[in-house]
């Protein structure tokens, strides 16, 4: 009896959540991303190990949220094309290639007095490297590495593309964002969305250029599919580069 009651309450809460998402196109596109960002913020806030466990949690939660909102967001569809593949490869080559030619975001903010400068030791301690926390080559370290590669290439792209390219870009045009055709080109949202996207990454300049490329795909094809695919390819290749070269600073 009690088990049935608990099951009924869970079903009621799930139905209530789905109804709220269905009633608000903005919440359906922005809510999952907000949860994803909140869990990202929690990484490292509850001890060193939480940096990795919260990434694991946000990957699972993010995948579940995508599944929940998928029926509500018509543009949330992957689309393969060679053009998307080329853009994805070009972006990761650019991301790695220009590294070192401009200051990372934390250093830039410290240079303009908006953040405290960090020593090399502090920066090294903040690297997302499971081998240093759980032991070189340990099963737990590799579990988190695989989780990050999969999470960044399968979960993050649809969440971020729906938020930035579908919601933010069109909302900048006008709050009634659904009245703005997906992929309509305008300079103001094109630039603002790219800067917002770039500022969410330590490699801010690469992030801005990356956003230009993904948004160009959306504007060209009038859909998100190619941008999601390009984003996934970029993150997958960058993840493999990080693991192969030990370039943990990109994570």
Model-based region annotation:
Residues 16, 20, 38, 46-49, ...:
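Juxtamembrane loop-transmembrane helix junctions in multi-pass integral membrane proteins
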Residues 24-93, 111-118:
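Alpha-helical transmembrane segments in multi-pass membrane proteins
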Residues 15-18, 41, 96-97:
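Helical anchoring/docking segments at protein termini
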Residues 2-22:
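Short, Lys/Arg-rich, polar N-terminal cytosolic tail immediately upstream
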Residues 45-48, 70-74, 104-108, 201-202, ...:
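Transmembrane helix-loop junctions in multipass membrane proteins, especially transporters and channels
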Residues 94, 135-251:
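Transmembrane helix-loop-helix hairpins at the membrane interface
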Residues 74-156, 170-184:
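Juxtamembrane helix-loop-helix connectors linking adjacent transmembrane helices
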């Amino acid at each position: 009896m009690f088990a049935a009651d608990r099951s009924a309450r869970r079903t009621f809460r799930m139905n209530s959540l789905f109804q709220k998402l269905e009633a608000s196109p903005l919440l359906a596109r922005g809510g999952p991303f907000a949860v994803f960002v909140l869990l990202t913020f929690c990484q490292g806030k509850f001890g060193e190990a939480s940096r990795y466990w919260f990434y694991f949690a946000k990957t699972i939660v993010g995948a579940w949220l995508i599944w929940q909102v998928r029926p509500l967001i018509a543009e949330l569809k992957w689309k393969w094309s060679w053009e998307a593949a080329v853009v994805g490869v070009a972006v990761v080559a650019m991301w790695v290639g220009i590294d070192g030619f401009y200051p990372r975001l934390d250093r830039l903010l410290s240079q303009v007095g908006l953040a405290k400068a960090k020593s090399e030791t502090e920066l090294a301690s903040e690297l997302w490297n499971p081998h240093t926390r759980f032991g070189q080559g340990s099963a737990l370290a590799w579990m988190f590495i695989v989780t990050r590669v999969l999470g960044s290439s399968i979960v993050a792209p649809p969440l971020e593309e729906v938020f930035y390219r579908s919601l933010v870009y069109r909302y900048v045009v006008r709050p009634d964002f659904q009245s703005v055709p997906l992929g309509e080109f305008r300079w103001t949202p094109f630039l603002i969305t790219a800067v917002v996207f770039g500022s969410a990454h330590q490699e801010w300049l690469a992030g801005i250029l990356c956003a230009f490329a993904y948004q160009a795909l959306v504007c060209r094809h009038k859909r998100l599919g190619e941008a999601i695919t390009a984003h996934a390819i970029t993150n997958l290749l960058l993840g493999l580069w990080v693991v192969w070269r030990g370039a943990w600073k990109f994570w």
